Amino acid sequence: RVCFAIPLPICH
């Protein structure tokens, strides 16, 4: 699982 917070927090 990869999570990013730019610009919104999204996890795949």
Curated annotation (Swiss-Prot):
<dbReference type="GO" id="GO:0042742">
    <property type="term" value="P:defense response to bacterium"/>
</dbReference>
<feature type="modified residue" description="Histidine amide">
    <location>
        <position position="12"/>
    </location>
</feature>
<keyword id="KW-0878">Amphibian defense peptide</keyword>
<comment type="function">
    <text>Antibacterial activity against B.subtilis, E.coli, S.aureus, M.luteus and P.putida. Antifungal activity against S.cerevisiae.</text>
</comment>
<dbReference type="GO" id="GO:0050832">
    <property type="term" value="P:defense response to fungus"/>
</dbReference>
<keyword id="KW-0929">Antimicrobial</keyword>
<dbReference type="GO" id="GO:0031640">
    <property type="term" value="P:killing of cells of another organism"/>
</dbReference>
<dbReference type="GO" id="GO:0005576">
    <property type="term" value="C:extracellular region"/>
</dbReference>
<keyword id="KW-0295">Fungicide</keyword>
<keyword id="KW-0044">Antibiotic</keyword>
<keyword id="KW-0027">Amidation</keyword>
<keyword id="KW-1015">Disulfide bond</keyword>
<protein>
    <recommendedName>
        <fullName>Tigerinin-2</fullName>
    </recommendedName>
</protein>
<keyword id="KW-0964">Secreted</keyword>
<feature type="disulfide bond">
    <location>
        <begin position="3"/>
        <end position="11"/>
    </location>
</feature>
